């Protein structure tokens, strides 16, 4: 309650069915252009990274490169950016928070090898990064890694959980 929701998306703003389904602000961006989000990220208290693509069985070099870029490397750049912002503003009353939704593919096999590889990579990078932050840095930024389970979505059309069930658990 009382949150101002900013959506960062590659896609145009969808038509919301109700006001509750809609972000108050919609910012379009593309992988590789993370720096253009600096002014927006400076206003964010809680950043939730949840983007990705699922290439299915396509393992061509081009598809694997795109999957790694979208699912892992773009996340990594945004994590570093948000860390820098938090580190420069350590006097805040409340720490910033960074939530990274990796995937159940981080802990169990996925039908898509490229998806599994990319999600495991970002999961490992998040763990590695968190272990290298000082106590002072950890006080300025809370980092949370989410592994939500196999819920049905555009990325996982055969998921066994509903997104509503998973969201209630968080």
In which residue ranges do the predicted regions lie?
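Catalytic loop of short-chain dehydrogenase/reductase
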Residues: 56-61, 83, 87-140, 147-155
């Amino acid at each position: 309650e009382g949150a101002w929701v900013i959506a960062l998306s590659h896609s145009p703003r969808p038509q919301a069915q109700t006001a509750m389904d809609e972000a108050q602000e919609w910012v379009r961006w593309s992988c590789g252009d993370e720096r253009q989000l600096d002014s927006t990220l400076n206003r964010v208290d809680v950043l939730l990274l949840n983007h990705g693509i699922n290439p299915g069985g396509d393992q061509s070099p081009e598809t694997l490169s795109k999957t790694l870029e979208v699912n892992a490397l773009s996340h990594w750049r945004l994590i570093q950016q948000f860390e820098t912002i938090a580190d420069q503003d350590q006097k805040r009353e409340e720490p910033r928070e960074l939530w990274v939704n990796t995937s159940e593919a981080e802990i169990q096999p996925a039908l898509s090898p490229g998806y599994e590889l990319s999600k495991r990579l970002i999961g490992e990078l998040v763990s590695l990064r968190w272990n290298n932050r000082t106590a002072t840095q950890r006080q300025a930024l809370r980092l949370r890694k989410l592994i939500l389970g196999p819920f049905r979505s555009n990325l996982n059309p055969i998921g066994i959980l509903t997104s509503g069930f998973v969201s209630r658990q968080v």
